[in-house]
Amino acid sequence: MDKQAERDQSAGPVKTPQETQPPAHNYTYHTNAAQRAVYDYLKNVKPIPELAEPKTYKTYEEASVEAVLYPIIEKHQVIMVAGAFFGDEGKGKTVNAVANHPGCTFIARVNSGENAGHTVYDDAGRKFVFNLAPSGLLSKGKRNYVGPECVMDPISFMENEVKQLIEANVPYKEQLFIGNVSIVTPYHKLLDLLASAPNSSTLKGMAPIHASKVTKRGIRLDHIFNDQSVLRSRLRKDIDTYFGFLKVKGLSDADVLRRCEKENGDGVVRVPPYVVEFVQAEDKVEYLVKLYMDRVRNNKNFPARCDVAHELRSALSRGEKVMLEGPQSYWLSNAREKFWESTTSADTTASGLLATAQYNFQLYSSVVINVHKAPGSSRVGVGANPSSFVAQDYFSAKGVKTLRDLPENMCVDFDSIQKLFFTKAFHPETKEYNGIWEPLEFEDSTGKYNIGVAMAVASSRHHGECGAVTKKPRVCGFFDCVLQYEVNAVQGPYLSISALDRGDDYDKLGITIAYVYYNGKNNEVLNINGREYKNGDIIKAGEAVPGEAALYYCHPIVKLINGWKQTPIAASKRKPGDPLPRGVCEFLSTVEYFTKAKIISIGNGPRGKDIIYIKQ
């Protein structure tokens, strides 16, 4: 870690991560005094030599899926498609490409739950939104499984996912099999709702159900299909957590009902009707037993059940190839201590997939294809995100649940905003350019906005970066090489970058190649994993990523890349085989240089086939 010579060297009080909280909320639409003070410090940070790297840029050429992806698949028995950032990376396209390989016949989700989500299209162009169902359901001749370490709300699964398959006449009964999953009940979702800040959770009950799971309470799918007395007993034991929470918080059923109505008040159904009915039920355990009897056990449309882990091992022993479809991502994994307070509750790294798939990794070769998204790399929820345009909890703190909560015409002129940001807020023409952006103001008919706020709102609008169902805005930012380097070191080298055709709309693009730490206090030192972080410290790609307590105060050092507006790569505008623009080559070269990844493909459109494979 480089030390800035000009920083205040006086040793101040040392704080541990447990004592350090996220920056206090003082968020405004316009640039405030605190933001100007941060910039006044950061603008004097000396440039790092890495801003001039790489010295030369590679030229990349297009190749076929058979020449790039298929050899990787054919060398291995287990292929994992995993998120490389904070989820929502556009993994579905790569998942479909792997699933379409003739030798890949077994496709599985093996952990996490319906808080994951992906949009996929079948050969007829029909759109499907899946949360827990594997994408291979739309490929003929593939068997799809939901493994026992997944968590499932079977009511939601039937209403939102299986219903789509039934209406589209997809023969899922022959293709979809469910393991002995842990059951997400209405009270898990209510605990999630009552304990979460706006825009900070998917409200799918993930933390509460995993708490039930690790404390060996709760129920699994097999309990619904067996002795009802055991089912009742286990539900009565587990539901005590919910009743205890209400007692501690002094909440009644009427209070909870009002909270549900408020959450659904803007027309987006975040709390489904059966959860509301649970709140209203006098005997809540009996309500659940009847609910599961009527809509799961006695439902002829419920998919077949099986021992998924056994089926997976049997498939491998027969020489079949298995694809594990990763939910969320590396940095959203609860098994990664750097962000563990703001992650999901399952291990969603590639190693987490491997562990929950329950096969002998000594016998079968595995490979990981990581997926990142750029431009407009995004994260939902709360937590640190050094490369974002605004603080990760900005929308949450402002009470913004959906884009509809913003002024109707606020920051809709994406082109003007990105032009101001990349051509005026940065100063690459100066000798002392250090990769820090100036907090300029953007003005439209609705008011004046800090340029970071304008970029965050405009990116969410322009790129559709909001939840497919919740419409919750994602917080966008730069491609982050500091975080991606660790992902590559742990589960690389293969990387697919989705949505790169978005770059068609930019004058320039930014890539985070390092962070500078600044907490706004002159002498405070933060001690994480035995290292002291002081104002002005630089954290580069390849160095240890600090914990979240420090990451809240890390600011991106941004390398600017030339755009390619005049030579768009979108599938609707580009002819297959056309040379890739210089700006694209600059972008890919920079990412490979700083992360050591091997980029195998880039996305260039919404359709499943809109992928450009990169000649290796």
UniProtKB/Swiss-Prot annotation:
Q: Which GO terms describe its biological process?
A: 'de novo' AMP biosynthetic process; IMP metabolic process
Query: Cofactor note from UniProt?
Result: Binds 1 Mg(2+) ion per subunit.
Question: Which keywords belong to this entry?
Answer: Cytoplasm, GTP-binding, Ligase, Magnesium, Metal-binding, Nucleotide-binding, Purine biosynthesis
Q: What is its main location?
A: cytoplasm
Which superkingdom, per the lineage? Eukaryota
Pathway given for this chain reads:
Purine metabolism; AMP biosynthesis via de novo pathway; AMP from IMP: step 1/2
Could you tell me the EC number(s) of this protein?
A: 6.3.4.4
The record's annotation in SUPFAM superfamilies points to:
P-loop containing nucleoside triphosphate hydrolases
Residues binding GTP, per UniProt: G87, D88, E89, G90, K91, G92, K93, G117, H118, T119, R474, G603, N604, G605
Q: Name one GO cellular component term.
A: cytoplasm
Task: Give the residues annotated as active site.
Answer: D88, H118
Under catalytic activity, the entry for this protein gives: IMP + L-aspartate + GTP = N(6)-(1,2-dicarboxyethyl)-AMP + GDP + phosphate + 2 H(+)
Q: Which cofactor does it need?
A: Mg(2+)
GO molecular function: any one?
Answer: magnesium ion binding
What residue spans carry the Polar residues bias annotation?
17-26
Q: Where does IMP bind?
A: D88, E89, G90, K91, N115, A116, G117, H118, T202, K216, Q328, T343, K472
Where, in this chain's numbering, is substrate bound?
A468, V469, T470, K471, K472, P473, R474
Which Gene3D superfamilies does the record cross-reference, listed alphabetically? Adenylosuccinate Synthetase, subunit A, domain 1, Adenylosuccinate Synthetase, subunit A, domain 2, Adenylosuccinate Synthetase, subunit A, domain 3
Q: Where is this region: Disordered?
A: 1-26
Per UniProt, subcellular location reads as: Cytoplasm
Q: Which HAMAP family match?
A: Adenylosucc_synth (MF_00011)
Explain the purpose of this protein: Plays an important role in the salvage pathway for purine nucleotide biosynthesis. Catalyzes the first committed step in the biosynthesis of AMP from IMP.
Family label: Belongs to the adenylosuccinate synthetase family.
**Assembly and oligomerization:** Homodimer.
Give additional notes from the record. Parasitic protozoa lack the de novo purine biosynthesis pathway and rely exclusively on the salvage pathway for their purine nucleotide requirements.
Which named protein is this?
Adenylosuccinate synthetase 2
Species for this entry: Trypanosoma cruzi (strain CL Brener)
Q: What is the lineage of its organism?
A: Eukaryota, Discoba, Euglenozoa, Kinetoplastea, Metakinetoplastina
